[in-house]
C-alpha cells in the first residue's frame, strides 16, 4: 500500500473531549498525525489535523473516529498558519 496524507477537520462532542482518540488511532493504525490547529472547550473540541500513513489504515482510522461519534470532514483548502 502506498502512503497518503489527509487533512481533516475533526469535531469532538462533549462526551469525547477528554478521550485520547487521536492517540488511539495513532497506535492502532500506525498513523502519524500533525495537529495544525486546535480549539477545545468543556463542551466541544475541534482539530485541524493531518493524518499520514498507509491508505487503508488512514481510512480505517477515519472510520473508527466516525463510529466513536467524531464528525470528520476532509479539508480541501490550505490551513493558514
Predicted ranges, named:
Residues 1-46, 50-81:
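Long, contiguous binding/interaction regions
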Amino acid at each position: 500500500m502506498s502512503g497518503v496524507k489527509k487533512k481533516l477537520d475533526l469535531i469532538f462532542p462533549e462526551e469525547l473531549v477528554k478521550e485520547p482518540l487521536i492517540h488511539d488511532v495513532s497506535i492502532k493504525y500506525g498513523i502519524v498525525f500533525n495537529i495544525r490547529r486546535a480549539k477545545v472547550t468543556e463542551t466541544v473540541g475541534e482539530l485541524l489535523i493531518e493524518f499520514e500513513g498507509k491508505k487503508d489504515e488512514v481510512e480505517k482510522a477515519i472510520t473508527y473516529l466516525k463510529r466513536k461519534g467524531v464528525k470528520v470532514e476532509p479539508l480541501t483548502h490550505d490551513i493558514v498558519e
